[in-house]
Amino acid sequence: MQQLNPSEISEIIKGRIEKLDVASQARNEGTIVSVSDGIVRIYGLADVMYGEMIEFPGGVYGMALNLEQDSVGAVVLGEYQGLAEGMNAKCTGRILEVPVGPELLGRVVDALGNPIDGKGPIDAKATDAVEKVAPGVIWRKSVDQPVQTGYKSVDAMIPVGRGQRELIIGDRQIGKTALAVDAIINQKDSGIKCVYVAIGQKQSTIANVVRKLEENGALANTIVVAASASESAALQYLAPYSGCTMGEYFRDRGEDALIVYDDLSKQAVAYRQISLLLRRPPGREAYPGDVFYLHSRLLERASRVSEEYVEKFTNGAVTGKTGSLTALPIIETQAGDVSAFVPTNVISITDGQIFLESAMFNSGIRPAVNAGISVSRVGGAAQTKIIKKLSGGIRTALAQYRELAAFAQFASDLDEATRKQLEHGQRVTELMKQKQYAPMSIAEMSLSLYAAERGFLQDVEIAKVGSFEQALISYFQREHAALLAKINEKGDFNDEIDAGIKAGIEKFKATQTW
């Protein structure tokens, strides 16, 4: 039997030691001091960073939000019932990330990107940070391409462009979600990817929205991020940022995306709850001092970015394409009070607002868009040419009608011109009505606007304006399908299209079939 001498043994041991590769892990650990209402106070964690993920026993994670002199206040992401005083907490050195990419389209996920629709796991190839800095001024482009919502009243009077932030504001149960969901349904063939973020809603309401999107063929290009009312305030606070990161994936690769936040009032309430539990000083309406920043840093991420930005981001893989993320935040008001704290904040951040009014909704005007208060600050440059040309008199007609209607209640005998204006206003108001889940194409909208603008509705009874419009569109779909296809394709308005629409409407009116 061969014997090793001591020098050989020491050489072998030395060689093994040199080859041994043990990465030393310096772990920053702390101890849980208290757990209450989803807020954990931790003693230690000297090197923790703001927003860093903290690991608790049992695979539960939290997020550091308060960095105090001798303790750290963290919010638990998920169930906190298993945590107790004296347990260990570890720094991870990571910030919160969620899965992103086309694999999420057609799925319903929670605020952390985990699937909750029972369709199996999501095999996302990439993840991205939930909190990101918005693109700088240099990388942005002005808004000049439209997002068609499919609503006449919005596309004609308050147009939305790609990369714009357009607020939808109004009381509860007034059609805010309906308007936003219809805008998503209208994108099913436009190539715009959509993200619907539900914050603090009933699970039955979210399930209903998902079902409607599926029925109308729009779920395949939509990601639904749900943080329902039964989930923790932390997840309701994070959901909009997670959804925004998922939408930015498409923006940064030269594609167009649309995101709906339904609604940011509930996110502000969730953030107020977290802040008060963290013992931060309350301000107006008990909201913390940084509630404006809460929404501004979210909404500034919606933008239209230049070709150079996309090229730089994709390392030259995508060239000559701009990307955009259009935001439709929703805010719920109390008794129409737009001067409350959160509504005024969001109005000042966004590029315009669509104001829905209870009185109009209750009188049967749906969508209940108040054309007087609603405005789009940048969408005009993005409006489709034919809609822009034909919708000029619509807003004026409605504004004059509302003014005269109030005046007409007191005056018994009206002159001919005033009476005509009133009747025209009534017909336009009737024409602006639209059923839910029935978005209109550019060509269909153009027919309605042309009929109103060129006086073809003057001899139509006010009660029959709706049926006249339906019959007119059906007639054109049968007899002038090529003209409609041409309008939808180009969106231009010239003498040839003008003559085509005029001749078609005149022939239709001769049939008297409405």
Curated annotation (Swiss-Prot):
It is a peripheral membrane protein. The gene is atpA. F-type ATPases have 2 components, CF(1) - the catalytic core - and CF(0) - the membrane proton channel. CF(1) has five subunits: alpha(3), beta(3), gamma(1), delta(1), epsilon(1). CF(0) has three main subunits: a(1), b(2) and c(9-12). The alpha and beta chains form an alternating ring which encloses part of the gamma chain. CF(1) is attached to CF(0) by a central stalk formed by the gamma and epsilon chains, while a peripheral stalk is formed by the delta and b chains. The record marks 374 as: Required for activity. It is an enzyme of class 7 (translocase). InterPro entries: ATP_synth_asu-like_sf, ATP_synth_asu_C, ATP_synth_asu_C_sf, ATP_synth_F1_a_nt-bd_dom, ATP_synth_F1_asu, ATPase_a/bsu_AS, ATPase_F1/V1/A1_a/bsu_N, ATPase_F1/V1/A1_a/bsu_N_sf. NCBIfam families: atpA (TIGR00962), PRK13343.1 (NF009884). Belongs to the ATPase alpha/beta chains family. Its main location: membrane. One of its GO terms (cellular component) is plasma membrane. ATP binds at residues 170-177. One of its GO terms (molecular function) is proton-transporting ATP synthase activity, rotational mechanism. PROSITE patterns: ATPASE_ALPHA_BETA (PS00152). Produces ATP from ADP in the presence of a proton gradient across the membrane. The alpha chain is a regulatory subunit. It holds the Pfam family ATP-synt_ab_C. Gene3D superfamilies: 2.40.30.20, ATP synthase alpha/beta chain, C-terminal domain, P-loop containing nucleotide triphosphate hydrolases. It comes from Pseudomonas aeruginosa (strain ATCC 15692 / DSM 22644 / CIP 104116 / JCM 14847 / LMG 12228 / 1C / PRS 101 / PAO1). Keywords: ATP synthesis, ATP-binding, Cell inner membrane, Cell membrane, CF(1), Hydrogen ion transport, Ion transport, Membrane, Nucleotide-binding, Translocase, Transport. This is ATP synthase subunit alpha. Transmembrane segments: none annotated. It is found in: Cell inner membrane. PANTHER family: ATP SYNTHASE SUBUNIT ALPHA, MITOCHONDRIAL. It catalyses: ATP + H2O + 4 H(+)(in) = ADP + phosphate + 5 H(+)(out).
